Amino acid sequence: YGGRVAAKSACEQADVVDLSCATQIDFPPTSQISEIKQLNKVMQETMGVVRNENTLLNGIQTVQALTGNLPLLGMAVLKSALARKESRGAHWREDYPKSNDNDYLKTTVARFDGKQIQISFVPVPERR
């Protein structure tokens, strides 16, 4: 409800005459809601504070059965966590408890080529 009120207020106060705003929220079809709940559960179970290869692989296996953009994003997060074989900040792997600056002091990049997600690591630019 609050979102609709905010959207309506934003539309009323818009200073661009031709700006069209949607004041109705389109919720996903009921058939997708169960998949979204399943994705939510899997991500909470596998991407919590403590992670390891087995839980991440189980999460990947479950998410592979789901369709849509949200599961695709979840898959990118899971594969990124699996590829980073170290612990750093909020990413803590019990099977790799130490950080590894040599291999992973980098930004994780996930790319989707239309068929699969590719994970790579790009060096972090030096700070001046």
Question: Where are the language model's segments positioned?
Answer:
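Glycine- and aromatic-enriched mobile tails/lids
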Residues: 1-128
